[in-house]
Amino acid sequence: ILKGPTAMGMVKLMDDSDNGDTGANHYNFTIAASPDEITPQIVQGNVDIAAVPANLASVLYNKEGVDVSVLAVNTLGVLYIVENGDSVQSVADLKGKTIYASGKGATPEYALNYMLTANGIDPEKDVTIEYKSEHSECVAALAANEDAVAMLPQPFVTVAMTQNENIRVALDLTEEWEKASGDGDTKAALITGVVIARNDFIEAHPDAVETFLQQYEASVNYVNDNVAEAAVLVGNYDIVAAQVAEKAIPECNITFIAGNDMKAKLSSYLGILFEQNPAAVGGALPNDDFYYNAD
């Protein structure tokens, strides 16, 4: 699982697992700092279930020799444009600026490019996007430069604001994405993270997968309903400090969406990415068999 909202939604299940309270299912959790650490583990078959960026799930599905299904959406939009100052009131104000970001080749890059392009800003020419390998480096860049602008996900927005009172949220990428993607039924949700599993594991252990999904949904509900208690667990697992987690959890869009609802939301999101850059989803949109327990 990825360090961030994904891992935060999983903490109650991790705690139950450590206390031997997960019934017949036994778990071995690993928290990774970036998706690059997770991909080879799935490809090599070392991991049965993984929480990954939404587009990476599609890339893996399209990869030869990798057979995966998506079990659930676990994180909606968590990206924000933050700045050290007060110069960004709209997307148009980003023109000519340097934006620090991480997540090149994943949801953050595509969401940023989509938002800029929809507002008439060319990501290649009209702004300078400096990609860092980890979110913490963007937080450091914000602290070091008085007029810096960064794109950060929660909980790192809260981390940055805790470290520097001059940092403010300028734009919510989820709102900007929805504005850009149309009205009413055509509006596509910005999806950050999903849970996938190897198909050979699903076929060999169908009951264990169903139990996992029930326990994971319960964990997500616990985290959203018991923020203070969940924040302590987030701190215990060294994801972010408990006091940061307590402020961040309500902003993290931690969710559990499965079945047909997952398929509807995720397929429309991947469709937008595909239009923008087919490589973002692995060159082709996944077939129906990608979506676990969906018609």
Predicted regions and their residues:
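Short, surface-exposed acidic
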Residues: 123-127, 238-250, 280-287
